[in-house]
Every structure is written in C-alpha cells, then in structure tokens.
C-alpha cells in the first residue's frame, strides 16, 4: 500500500496529468472572466497569459521596466489582467493622491493572500486585516500606544544596548571585508524581539527563522493568488503544507511566550514592570484582559500572535535594505560620504558612542535617508489595495475586487517632479518640508491614506540610528582596491528593493572618534 501511494503521488504520469488538468482549468477560468459591457476600464494591454509577458527572471529592473514601458504607452492609470486578477497600476503622484485620498475608503481593503491568511492567523495583523472597526481600533492602538512617539522613545535603551553589541562585533573584524546586511539583521532581530516580547525569549531563533521563511515566500506574486477560486492550487504547489508546518513551529513559541508572561503577571500582580516588560506584548495583554484604554475592545491570543509576528516581520528586511542603499550611495559618492560623516562627528563631538536620542539632531543624515528611499524604495510597488466597491476616475471604471497598485518606483524617479531624477542628491530636501509620512505624494515609500504604515517613526529611527552609527564609529573602504565608480548598483525585486549583490565593505575604527 505504501509503495502504491508513493507511486501515485510522485510518478511522472501523475505529475503530467496533474499539470495538464491545471493548465486546462486555469485557461478556462481566464476565458470565463468577462468584462461587463458598457464599462470603460483604464487602458492596458490584452489579457496576460499565465506566464505571459511578465518578466520571469526575477530581476527587479525587468519588472519595473516592463511596467514603466506600459505606463508610457497607456498612461498613469493602467489596467492589467493576469489570470483571474484585475489590477490597476497607478504611476503618478497626482493620480495616487486622487485614488488614496478622494477614493480612500473605496480602496481601503487588502487582497487576502495565501501567505497572509495562514501566517497571520487569517490576516489579523494591521497590514492585511480587512477594513472595518477591528482595523480602525487596531491602528489607534498602534498610534497611541504600540508605536507612539513616547513608546519609540522608551525603546532607546534597547536600541542603544543592541547597537553596542553590533558595534563591538564590527570592531572585532576591522580590516576584513564584511557583509553589512548580516550585521544589521542581527541587530534588528535582537532589538525587535526585545521590543515586542521582552528580553526573555527562549524561542527567538524560531521567530527569526519563521520571519525569514515568510519573507522569502512573500517575495513575488504567487500563482496561488492569481487564481483565488482554484482552492486546490496551494495544495498542489506545496505552499499550504509549507506554511502550515511553519506556522505550527511559530505558534508553539508565541503561545509559550504569552503563557509565560501571563503567569508572571498573575503571580506578581502588584510588582512594577521591569523595563523589557513594558513592551508591545504587555500592551496587547491589557487589551486581552479588558484593561486597555478602550475597555470595550478585546483581543484574542491569535490577534496578539499575528500582531507580534507582523511587527518582527515588517521591521527587519526593509530597514536593513534602506541602510544598505544609503551606504551604497555614499560609497559611490565619496564627497557625500564625507559630508555625512562630518555632520555626525561634529554633532556628537566629545561622545564615545551614539544613542537613539541623538538622531533627531542629524539633519543631513535624514536627507540621505529620504533620497535613498526615493531612489530605492523598500516597496517599489506599494502593498496592493483591494477595491471594496466599483467607482470611476477620469471616466474610467475601477472594478470591485480589483487590485490597486501604486508604482512608487515610477513616482520616485519621475523627472516632472524630481530634477536629475536618477542622480543621488540628498540636498534636494534641504529647502523644503517634504517628508515620507503620507501627506507628500511625491515621497510615499511607506504608503499613504488609510493604510499608511503605522510604524514609520519606529522604522526610520532605527534606520537613522544604524546609518549614523556606521558613519560615526568607522571609516569605510571598498574591497580589492575597487573604485567608487566601479561599485555596482543593481537592484533585485524580491520582498522589497534589495541589492542584487550584498554590499561588502572593509571597516576601520575612526581615529577621530577614538581620540575624543
């Protein structure tokens, strides 16, 4: 019987028949997905086949060039059909503002992807939760408690502690080529685990492993999400099994963390909280027990687990990518590197190290970060919105359930907005108040409107702190005698906009700082 089962599931005949069945089924679904008569959709190419015209080599530039070429032909509002997916691509700041402001409620939902449904406990996190009362209340908790300015300030001690560990690690390897990304990820995972669930976390390795795996599985548009009515697709592809097994490991750790904290609170109800216990988990447990600021709003264990995991997931890869691009651009432009280092070392003159409290004083560092996310946004295509109802814009119909995707990469390099759009010029932000908090639509790398990222302050504080620490403590050079103009700046589209080849640099301890 075992041999028969193994043969039936793995034999070439079974795989061939399954593939033929799948192709026939998907093509039938694509043919059957008709456009309503009398509706004028935004212009766009004909329906794209299952693989079709989309670039398949995984290169970021291939996908972006493909979309930008289409936008030049069809305009800033463009319609694509990919499988069962109806997608509207927005490629201008003006139209992004109209969509996200004027029609904000209509596009306030998120598509329910396979990864989010499983790994976020049926999309309970703030990123993918359906628009409604739950999401509104959750965003308020983020703004007022979880990631408020006061809370972020309270995390400075944790940031400083983990940053010191990272700096010590780099100092032990001076003179040797190192991958900067690896050092940053170690810092970010350690800092985020402490900020979310406290210093005592026996399952930290599992949390990190699950975050890495989930990021990898979310790195591209998946065929399972292009044909949502074919429920068997995630099973055939093996995605459902992989995610389910991953969630089991993650869930055990998160349940243990919650249980341990609840037992401690019950056994010592009157004892003041330690610093690391004034974390995000502590805030969420208040809402589980009806002791939050809004006593009517309650969360379950699944809510807490989804929120905690999402916070760890969202705060690592994007932050590391931003700093890596900042350092890449500065190494490519030595005069800008000197200017940034001079500012940091002048502001911190007389100090031996940098702290979270220092980043607010570093104006040029902030400009470097803004310019970096303009050119190399952490999400070149912003998280898709899903239309809650049909509506019209410029006489064109945006269908219900269609995905609305903001092509921020195109906006960030639009020559109508940005002079010398392809050139790295932090000074362009010196005489204006443009920020990336969602009100300036020419700079929305973290989204805008009702689904703007609630963790911008926390994320940018970490980014600015990491970048300033690298500039303050170390001098840097490219390996192998490489010249600045020889440094490749190739981008790769995956879970975000990352370097195709990780940035490798050689650090040396700054004699200016050490001599203070």
UniProtKB/Swiss-Prot annotation:
The keyword Transcription does not apply. It catalyses: tetrahydroalstonine + A + reduced [NADPH--hemoprotein reductase] + O2 = alstonine + AH2 + oxidized [NADPH--hemoprotein reductase] + 2 H2O + H(+); ajmalicine + A + reduced [NADPH--hemoprotein reductase] + O2 = serpentine + AH2 + oxidized [NADPH--hemoprotein reductase] + 2 H2O + H(+). Its cofactor is heme. CDD domains: CYP71-like (cd11072). Its EC number is 1.14.14.-. One of its GO terms (cellular component) is endoplasmic reticulum membrane. This is Alstonine synthase. The gene is CYP71AY1.
